C-alpha cells in the first residue's frame, strides 16, 4: 500500500483516482502529477515501483500544498478575514453564507436546523 503525504492510497484503484484521496488533490491535479512523473493514468496503485512512488512524493512536496498545510492556510485566511473585520469575516463568524446568497429562505445547511420560536402558537 502506497503512503503519500500521510495518506494510505487504496490498492486496487487507478492512480488517477487514488491520488484524489489526498486532501487538496482533485482529478485535474492528479493528472498533472502523473504526467510530470511520466506514469500512466491507468496504472493501479499496487503495480507502482518504489521509484515511481518517490517521484510522485517529490512532485507533490515540491509543487503542491496538500493535507495539513492546505487546511492550515485555509483556516488562517478565514481567521485573517475575521480579525480584519471584513464583511466576509463577519459572515464566517455568524455562520451565514459568505458569497452573497439569499438567507430569508434557504441557506439551511450553513445556518443549521430551524429553531422553534417560543410563544408563537395561539
Curated annotation (Swiss-Prot):
PROSITE patterns to which the protein is assigned, alphabetical: RIBOSOMAL_S13_1 (PS00646), RIBOSOMAL_S13_2 (PS50159)
Single GO MF descriptor: structural constituent of ribosome
Subunit relationships: Part of the 30S ribosomal subunit. Forms a loose heterodimer with protein S19. Forms two bridges to the 50S subunit in the 70S ribosome.
PANTHER family named in the record: 30S RIBOSOMAL PROTEIN S13/40S RIBOSOMAL PROTEIN S18 (PTHR10871), SMALL RIBOSOMAL SUBUNIT PROTEIN US13M (PTHR10871:SF1)
Family: Belongs to the universal ribosomal protein uS13 family.
Function in brief: Located at the top of the head of the 30S subunit, it contacts several helices of the 16S rRNA. In the 70S ribosome it contacts the 23S rRNA (bridge B1a) and protein L5 of the 50S subunit (bridge B1b), connecting the 2 subunits; these bridges are implicated in subunit movement. Contacts the tRNAs in the A and P-sites.
Domain of life of the native organism: Bacteria
Region annotation Disordered: where it falls in the sequence: 94-122
Keyword tRNA-binding part of the UniProt annotation: yes
Record carries keyword Ribonucleoprotein: yes
Protein name: Small ribosomal subunit protein uS13
Signal peptide positions (record): none
Recorded name of the encoding gene: rpsM
Keywords: Ribonucleoprotein, Ribosomal protein, RNA-binding, rRNA-binding, tRNA-binding
GO cellular component labels: cytosol; small ribosomal subunit
InterPro entries per the UniProt record, alphabetical: Rbsml_uS13_C (IPR027437), Ribosomal_uS13 (IPR001892), Ribosomal_uS13-like_H2TH (IPR010979), Ribosomal_uS13_bac-type (IPR019980), Ribosomal_uS13_CS (IPR018269)
GO biological process, one term: translation
Amino acid at each position: 500500500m502506497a503512503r503519500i503525504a500521510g495518506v494510505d492510497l487504496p490498492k486496487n484503484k487507478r492512480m488517477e483516482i487514488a491520488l484524489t484521496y489526498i486532501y487538496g488533490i482533485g482529478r485535474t491535479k492528479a493528472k498533472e502529477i502523473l504526467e510530470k512523473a511520466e506514469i500512466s493514468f491507468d496504472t493501479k496503485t499496487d503495480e507502482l515501483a518504489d521509484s515511481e512512488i518517490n517521484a510522485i512524493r517529490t512532485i507533490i512536496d515540491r509543487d503542491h500544498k496538500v493535507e495539513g498545510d492546505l487546511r492550515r492556510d485555509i483556516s488562517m485566511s478565514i481567521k485573517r478575514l475575521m480579525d480584519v473585520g471584513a464583511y466576509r469575516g463577519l459572515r464566517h463568524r455568524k455562520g451565514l453564507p459568505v458569497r452573497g446568497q439569499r438567507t430569508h429562505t434557504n441557506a439551511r445547511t450553513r445556518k443549521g436546523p430551524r429553531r422553534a420560536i417560543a410563544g408563537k402558537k395561539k
